[in-house]
């Protein structure tokens, strides 16, 4: 068994903001949704061999505790944190996970995102 994808929700009409945040800021690549699923809206993206799906939820409630944890190479972590902060996203560093440097941020819809790298 492998993890195929993670889904987060966004409010109706969030696709443009999702593309900017996950694509332009985080560097994920958008993939085409199957034709039969396009009418429901949302955006699908890839992270290496896994996928991140942003689905539409109405009424929408952001995931403030449950979250995906993204891993980057150590040299990328500070650069990514700076890019997010410069774009107005909150970056909250957390040193409680031994052997990992990480921070939390939120997408434009309030969904919590963890981004980390091996320490040292």
How should each PLM-predicted stretch be described?
Residues 1-2, 61-65, 96-97:
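Short glycine-enriched loop/turn motifs at secondary-structure junctions
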Residues 1-19, 68:
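N-terminal beta-strand motif that seeds the catalytic metal site of vicinal oxygen chelate
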Residues 18-23, 84, 110:
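Conserved active-site tyrosine of GNAT-family acetyltransferases
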Residues 27-34, 88-94:
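Short secondary-structure junctions
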Residues 29-63, 112-117:
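Conserved short beta-strand elements that form part of the metal-binding/catalytic scaffold
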Residues 41-43, 66, 99-103:
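Short beta-strand micro-motifs in enzyme catalytic cores
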Residues 66-84:
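Mid-chain, well-packed structural core segment of small domains
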Residues 87-120:
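Vicinal oxygen chelate
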